[in-house]
Structures are given as C-alpha cells and as structure tokens.
Design a protein with these regions (language model features):
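Conserved beta-loop-beta/alpha segment of the NTase-like Rossmann-fold superfamily
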Residues: 5-90, 135, 139-140
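Fold-independent oxyanion-binding glycine-rich loops
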Residues: 11, 39-41, 48, 72-75, ...
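Alpha-helical scaffold segments in soluble metabolic enzymes
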Residues: 22, 26, 57-64, 84, ...
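Solvent-exposed alpha-helices and their adjacent loops that cap or buttress functional pockets
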Residues: 29-31, 37-38, 45, 61-63, ...
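A short, charged helix-loop
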Residues: 87-120, 155
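Short glycine- and hydrophobic/aromatic-rich loop-to-beta-strand nucleating segment
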Residues: 124-128
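Left-handed beta-helix
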Residues: 130-236
Length: 236
C-alpha cells in the first residue's frame, strides 16, 4: 500500500535524471543512508522470485560500496530499441564492471553486439545508495544539482512542494543514462534472468504475444494473412 506522501509529482517533464535526483534528495531527508531501486513502470517481469532475489542481491552490493548498479539482460535478438552494456572484468561475486554503454544502436551494430557475447541489454533497472547517486550528480550534472541542492533542508517538509514547483522546471532535460551512467567510472552490472521485457518496442511485444502456426501476431483486429510468416499486424 502506497501512502500519498510517497508519490512525487513532477511539475514538468525533464526526463529521468531530474526526477531521480529529486527522489534521492527526498529519500535522503527521510533516511540519510537509504538504498534505492529505480524501476520503470512499463516493464514486464515474469519471474517474480528471481527478480526479488536479484534486487536483494543488488541492494546488498550497493549498501557496502560507492557503486552505481544496473541489471543487465542477455539479448536474444539484435534489438535497436534498447541500450546495450558491454561488460568488463568480473568482481568475483557475480558483478561486472561496465566497460561501455551504447544507447539504441543501428541494426548492424546491434547484430555485432549480440554475436560478440560481451553485450547485454540495459534494463533501466538501477540500484544505488542515496549518497552515491547524489555525489555522481554533483560531479557530472552540476547544473541539475544547482537547482535541487538548495532545498536540502526543505525536502520531506511542507515547503517541498513549493520549492519543487519553482525550481524543477528549470532543471536540464537529461536522461540518467546519458547524464550519469554513460560517464561515471563506478558503474557495475549484475546479470539477471527474470523474464524481463520492456514493452516499449515491437520486438518485445511480439515475443510476448500469441502467434499462429506461421508465427504471425494479430492485435486488435481480425486479419487474413496469405503466404506471410513472422509478421505483427496492429490496427489503430
């Protein structure tokens, strides 16, 4: 059950870095050493127990280190709608240093990534300690921090709403991936297999949909398909 006080409403759309930074400041005001899970609302998780275990493992990792953690998914196709993580040396406890981030590559490059075995999908599921992510923002996104840090004694009080309404719209429009994850040198990845899918791409929707014997998927329509295989048909 969520309490109304646990819901933070953005007064303007400014991509993912500002809202995550605001949440970190707000949570730190309530718990100065909190560990956070960042989870997009439109992702599908089919294996809940495996997912829960991955989250517990990840939170334990970030609670004892100043590291930013993302969950990586082994790709089963050259998807151009996802970001990719190239893994570096393992830490010995099931985590890997991130070597590179690549955001939504062209098809040919995505094919190379999948064939190499070194690249994993970036799930967009992140974990970190509040102080670690705020420190990263201070280094890499000083313009953003200049808008939100002055409210450090205001967060989680009755004055927070007015402060955010005044300052949040002036935050730079930047994603957490581009603003921090692609630039920080303390990013690690844990590889997961918990039935993850980002429903924001046609490929992921196809994988999850019922198909006919020729591999065709028909959504929101009745269609007659002649001599067609592995298609997806969607009518508005």
């Amino acid at each position: 059950e969520l309490d109304e006080k646990q819901i933070l409403l953005e007064p303007a759309r400014r991509n993912t870095a500002p809202c995550i930074a605001w949440a970190a400041y707000h949570i730190r005001a309530l718990n100065p050493n909190a560990n956070i899970v960042v989870a997009p609302s439109d992702h599908l998780i089919l294996k809940e127990e495996e997912f829960r275990a991955a989250i517990i493992k990840g939170l334990e990792f970030v609670s004892h280190s100043e590291k930013l953690l993302t969950l990586g998914i082994k790709p089963n196709r050259p998807e151009t709608g996802y970001g990719y993580i190239q893994i570096d040396e393992p830490t010995g406890d099931g985590f890997y240093k991130v070597k590179t981030f690549t955001e939504k590559p062209e098809l040919e490059l995505a094919k190379v990534f999948v064939e190499s075995g070194e690249f994993y999908w970036n799930s967009g599921l992140f974990m970190w300690n509040v102080n670690t992510i705020i420190k990263a923002a201070e280094i890499l996104l000083p313009e953003l921090v200049s808008k939100l840090a002055p409210g450090k004694n205001i967060y989680a009080t009755d004055k927070e709403k007015a402060f955010i309404e005044e300052n949040f719209p002036a935050c730079p429009n930047v994603s957490i991936d581009f603003g921090i994850m692609e630039k920080a040198d303390n990013v690690y990845v844990s590889l997961g297999d918990f039935g993850w899918s980002d429903l924001g791409t046609w490929g992921s929707l196809y994988d999850l949909s019922e198909r006919d014997r020729e591999g065709n998927v028909t959504l929101k329509s009745h269609s007659l398909i002649y001599n067609g295989k592995d298609n997806m048909i969607v009518l508005p």
